[in-house]
């Protein structure tokens, strides 16, 4: 690799410092799917909520739009990642920012993507509470798992974006600091 395509060690260190906490947030949000599953299992055993399908029959048709919203959330994760991490868009948004501010912006954007990935499992939990359809919860939890897989914060992807930004905004990388 040439000097222009490689990120120096100080920038990689700073990138790791940003990605570490992001991955903790990612793990916690993915872990929330398990927490919701435990809640559903406990409620099933206790038998208090939901009241049953007969009470939900009048609005049973709502299941399908909520499934569609779960699928839309997966698509939104893909679109958001592409738009928020598009190198040209990052370069435009980097106007007037230094490297730590840029990394903070990217980090905040990544958390937004995670939040969208959690939408399907929350919809599934709501459907289970209202109608008692366990399958609804499982399907929508599965969609959340897919959305989270699509949202994983890849160090390689972040490096590629920063290399591209460095090409057009080298002043951001002039003195990154040695300790991050």
Where do the model's predicted regions map?
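Select subsegments of transmembrane alpha-helices in polytopic membrane proteins
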Residues: 23-31, 107-118
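Hydrophobic alpha-helical membrane-embedded segments
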Residues: 67-83, 144-152
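Short membrane-interface loop/juxtamembrane segments of multi-pass integral membrane proteins
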Residues: 92-116
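Short terminal or interdomain "cap/linker" segment that borders an active site or interface and mediates
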Residues: 2, 90-94, 141-180
